[in-house]
Structure formats: structure tokens, C-alpha cells
A protein has these predicted regions:
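Positively charged, small/polar-rich N-terminal and surface patches that mediate targeting and assembly
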Residues: 1-102
């Protein structure tokens, strides 16, 4: 088994969920996260004062799947989450030794 973690734009969450469902993924975890990479944030004006927003809002989608599904799931996430702009996100894959139901 492997855990696939994808950090994506919040607006792409519904598309990614639908793509994962098409792949046969039946469970996932979604977490709101903040961070930056090459995008580095942006500057915003509010009531005449300039503010720097350095940590951007993203969504982390986590799925634990059989290793045989890994390539299909990664391709589905990439296709659904990609806009072609800087800040589309990252995908991380880690091995899972065991998953225990509580």
C-alpha cells in the first residue's frame, strides 16, 4: 500500500474528488492547509494599507491505495488539478506498512 498526498488549489477539489472516484478510490481525507513554494504569495491592499500574504490557502487530499493503483491515481490527480499556472500543487507518495481499522 501507498499513501498519496496531493496539495492542490481549493477550487480544484471537486474535480480531483470526481477523478479519484472514477479510479475506484472510495475513501479520502481532505485537510485545509497553508504554505508557499515558487508562487511565494502576493500583496493585497485593504483600506489603503498594503499587506503581504505569504502563506497561500491550499487543500491536502490524502488517499491510501494498493500500489497497483498508484500510477492511475497520480495521473488522475494531475489531470484534474492542473491549471498550467505556478502554484498548482505537489504530489507526495509514501509507503504504508499497515493500515489498522479502529
Amino acid at each position: 500500500m501507498v499513501k498519496v498526498e496531493a496539495i492542490i488549489r481549493p477550487l480544484k477539489l471537486d474535480e480531483v474528488k470526481a477523478a479519484l472516484h472514477e479510479c475506484g478510490v472510495r475513501g479520502l481525507t481532505v485537510t485545509e492547509v497553508r504554505g508557499f513554494g515558487k508562487q511565494r504569495g502576493y500583496t493585497e491592499r485593504y483600506r489603503g494599507t498594503e499587506y503581504t500574504v505569504s502563506l497561500l490557502h491550499k487543500v491536502k487530499v490524502e488517499v491510501v491505495i494498493p500500489e497497483e493503483m498508484m500510477d492511475e491515481v497520480i495521473e488522475a490527480i494531475m489531470a484534474a488539478a492542473r491549471t498550467g499556472e505556478i502554484g498548482d500543487g505537489k504530489i507526495f507518495v509514501t509507503p504504508v506498512i499497515e493500515a489498522i481499522r479502529i
